[in-house]
């Protein structure tokens, strides 16, 4: 019994399972068919809408053609018939025939108008709604576009006005530089660049510092750069108001009188010394008197220029007085000068003379300048003027004249000493 029941249950389960599978397959097939049908329906609806639009276009074209044909048929043929009949009439025909002909012409004209009017009404009714709808849409889009373009134009104009108010032209900074001659194409520009200015008395030999700042320097480095450049004779490029710098004029030396006087004195000294070596002291004194040059000033200037210049055949005129030998000289020979001549050499090439050699002095910044007090050290007497010098009376070593500081000045004392050299005493 149990086996039979189990077999029956298995069969029933298999049948139920098969029925469920058939149901599922039927449902799936139904879904696929419905989807296919819906897709076909959509495609057919699209085709119908497309065909409807084509039909509407064809109807509109047909209405336009019919309207043109009706206008031509209603006006032109009637005129032709009336004109031909009127032209064919003769004066011999009776008046009644003319009246009857006109009446005949009016009858077909009225009939044609009655036939054409229902056609126009039907065409307007059939195609009036789609044409009016399309025309309304076109007009609406046109006016929308026109309004949008008008807004864009107004906005662009407002932006232009606002930018023109905000746009301030920047003033270009003028750079201080010289324009070469070959870069100017017009003659008036060249003449304007090289026109002589009012500042013609500027000494080109002296070091000049312009307001041109070197490139790559900050504001805090500008002062130090000027201090370093002030030690040299640096020539900066000319500015617009200083174009005379480009003229090919010979430069004037900074100090003319001492250089020329020393050159003349040197030539005359060499000639006189070769002719008569014994009288070279007097010759040198007369040369200084002829040129009108202070020997002390010439000697000091010569000492200052020894480190800056390098002449080849000049003579170092080192002026020395005989203050320490004043007791041995007669009273009238105080104007004699002893000139020690040595060829001027470069400090690197010149041999170092011994300190014990008489009549020679070591060149360089350590060389002492002539002092009216030979017995004192160089540190105790300073020509620049100190507080101790203001209270010490000055005594002339030539004539033993006393110059108290309360009455006389340092300039008076120096002029008195210069009078001894020029032979005024």
UniProtKB/Swiss-Prot annotation:
The record marks 272-273, 291-292 as: (Microbial infection) Cleavage. It is found in: Cytoplasm. A zinc finger (UBZ1-type) spans 393-420. The modification Phosphoserine is found at residues 126, 129, 178, 208, 225, 228, 341, 354, 357. Residues 22-62 form a coiled coil. Changing residue 247 to A: No effect on cleavage by Seneca Valley virus protease 3C. Residues 172-191 are annotated as: TRAF family member interaction. The record marks 197, 291 as: Cleavage by EMCV protease 3C. Pfam families: TBD. The modification Phosphothreonine is found at residue 213. Residues 133-172 are annotated as: Interaction with TBK1 and IKBKE. Changing residue 184 to A: Abolishes interaction with TRAF2 and TRAF3. Keywords: Acetylation, Coiled coil, Cytoplasm, DNA damage, Host-virus interaction, Metal-binding, Phosphoprotein, Zinc, Zinc-finger. Ubiquitous. Changing residue 188 to A: Diminishes interaction with TRAF2 and TRAF3. Changing residue 194 to A: Diminishes interaction with TRAF2 and TRAF3. Changing residue 291 to A: Complete loss of cleavage by Seneca Valley virus protease 3C. It comes from the Eukaryota. Residues 1-31 are annotated as: Necessary for interaction with ZC3H12A. One of its GO terms (cellular component) is serine/threonine protein kinase complex. Phosphorylated by IKBKE. PANTHER family: TRAF FAMILY MEMBER-ASSOCIATED NF-KAPPA-B ACTIVATOR. Homodimer. Found in a deubiquitination complex with TANK, USP10 and ZC3H12A; this complex inhibits genotoxic stress- or interleukin-1-beta-mediated NF-kappaB activation by promoting IKBKG or TRAF6 deubiquitination. Interacts with IKBKG; this interaction increases in response to DNA damage. Interacts with TRAF6; this interaction increases in response to DNA damage and recruits USP10 to the ubiquitinated TRAF6. Interacts with USP10; this interaction increases in response to DNA damage. Interacts with ZC3H12A; this interaction increases in response to DNA damage. Interacts with TBK1. (Microbial infection) Interacts with vaccinia virus protein C6. Adapter protein involved in I-kappa-B-kinase (IKK) regulation which constitutively binds TBK1 and IKBKE playing a role in antiviral innate immunity. Acts as a regulator of TRAF function by maintaining them in a latent state. Blocks TRAF2 binding to LMP1 and inhibits LMP1-mediated NF-kappa-B activation. Negatively regulates NF-kappaB signaling and cell survival upon DNA damage. This is TRAF family member-associated NF-kappa-B activator. The gene is TANK.
